[in-house]
Amino acid sequence: MGHNLVAVQSLQRSLLTPTIGFIRKRHVQPGQRLTTMNARAETVGQLRTYKSAWAKSQLYLVPMLRFFEPNWEQPTHVRWSIGMATGEPFAVASLYREWEEENGKKSFSFTQLTISADDHPFMNRFHRPDEEKRSLVIIPSSDYDEWLGCKNPERARTYLQPYPAELMAGQPAPKVAAPMQNELF
């Protein structure tokens, strides 16, 4: 099942179900490893993978209740669930790409935009101690229409800001092992 995205098409919001990862796996050359789940805001307009979509302002929002990041404040990492302090849904800035499939139908894929979180009072707690800290870009709900309708890449860049730490919350959320098949308890 894909993720729902919100986009503006013909001056109306549309809900699509694209796949995560900007380059669909079937379009990656055998033996090539290409990770496109996230795109760095600092280079999204320069990298060949994203340059065209960024120039065309193919901007989307990915609605979420939470996302997960590894916290390394202990000797071994602990998965954390991160969301709004209010528990309300929010949306993350993303970039989409349209594909024409062999059957002639259109499909969509997306990448989430990230920014440095080295100086963020909350998001700097995540990822390995020796790695750069990154965060998804949360777009305030008051800016949804402006983000989705933005047709100027430099103006779009002004939305790629750290979200206020005091409006965010997180807690440990270790993965629960799935029960083995054919077991009742």
Where are these predicted regions, by residue range?
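Short, His- and charge-rich active-site/binding loops that engage polyanionic ligands
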Residues: M1-L59, G83, G104-K105
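Short, structured beta-strand/loop micro-motifs enriched in basic residues and often containing a Trp
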Residues: A41-G45, T114-P121
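Extended alpha-helical targeting/anchoring segments
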Residues: R48-K56, E69-L95
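Tight coil/turn sites that cap or link beta-strands
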Residues: L65-R66
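Short acidic/glycine-rich loop or secondary-structure boundary segments that cap or lie
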Residues: E69-E73, A91, E101-N103, P121-F122, ...
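A motif-centric signal for short, conserved binding hotspots located
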Residues: G83-S116
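C-terminal accessory segment of soluble enzyme catalytic cores
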Residues: K105, A117-F185
